[in-house]
Amino acid sequence: MGFKGYILSIVFNGKDFANKYYLMLKEFLKQHNLRDKIALKVVLANDEPASNLYVSIKSRVAKEIGLNVEVIKFSANSVQSDILEVIDRENKNLSTDGIIVQLPLLKGMDLNSILNSIVYSKDVDGLSFVNLGKMILGDKKGFIPCTALAVLKILRDEGIKTLGKTVVVVGRSPLVGRPISILLSSKPYDATVIVCHSKSIYLDVYLRQADIVISAVGKPRLIDKSMLCGKPYVIDIGISEIETDNGKILSGDTDFDNIKECVKFITPVKGGIGPVTVLMLMFNTIKAHLINNRMFDVLNRLEKLLEV
């Protein structure tokens, strides 16, 4: 769905968006005799219900399109060396194409040490220092973090122009906000990017300048309609639980019901950015297999298919 002219309040359907591409990937793997030949290993080192749900979704999607997936789960009394040992084993395993670590980790574990223990050619979440460096330098053999890649995919497919536009990114984490701001300020996106964070005093002033708002801070209902001007496009990556009279509900960084009529485009909390992030994980995993097996002609076809 592109924007040809002026369209009011498009609520993005990430589930339908991703499902369309899942069918394409499934057929692509079949055509190139790659079904059941690509393996993703998922390291799960926490017992949070949300993490278990996310892992089950990733596993289900991977299996549906034709990837092999194994979840390696660690108990609550596991130590960091246990995880590093498994990652080292899978780094050396020639049949493993991609390795991801489902966050958060158990308390006391060092995030950077674990993420950087994954060899960059299998780091399909794109969170190691090597891949973040490749992203900054524009090395296409590296892996862009999946959420950032999902944002780029949504902008491209929905016809949301970034050239010369003002993009306000709320959040500067190295996992989400920072990669997005770097990518959008680079070629070919060429946006003017303003990065806001917890210490930004005049958030509303910056937001009113935005053609595009991308928020990833995990603060429920941080952004309301009083902070926006000129009907921007809004991509809400944040997700939090809030208490209501009817129990806990999920909330994004935006007050969705409050602002949805004041924007041109918005992603909801449920069925918004999430399914597209999983789609990009599938893309990165297939890409890893193709690069590691020097199947560059097939990789070119994959990139054209998904337009990434």
From Swiss-Prot:
Swiss-Prot/TrEMBL catalytic activity: (6R)-5,10-methylene-5,6,7,8-tetrahydrofolate + NADP(+) = (6R)-5,10-methenyltetrahydrofolate + NADPH; (6R)-5,10-methenyltetrahydrofolate + H2O = (6R)-10-formyltetrahydrofolate + H(+)
Recorded GO CC terms: cytosol
Single GO biological process annotation from the record: tetrahydrofolate interconversion
UniProt keyword list: Amino-acid biosynthesis, Histidine biosynthesis, Hydrolase, Methionine biosynthesis, Multifunctional enzyme, NADP, One-carbon metabolism, Oxidoreductase, Purine biosynthesis
GO molecular function: methenyltetrahydrofolate cyclohydrolase activity; methylenetetrahydrofolate dehydrogenase (NADP+) activity
Pfam family, one: THF_DHG_CYH
Function field: Catalyzes the oxidation of 5,10-methylenetetrahydrofolate to 5,10-methenyltetrahydrofolate and then the hydrolysis of 5,10-methenyltetrahydrofolate to 10-formyltetrahydrofolate.
Family named by the database record: Belongs to the tetrahydrofolate dehydrogenase/cyclohydrolase family.
Subunit structure: Homodimer.
Name under which the protein is recorded: Bifunctional protein FolD
Encoding gene per record: folD
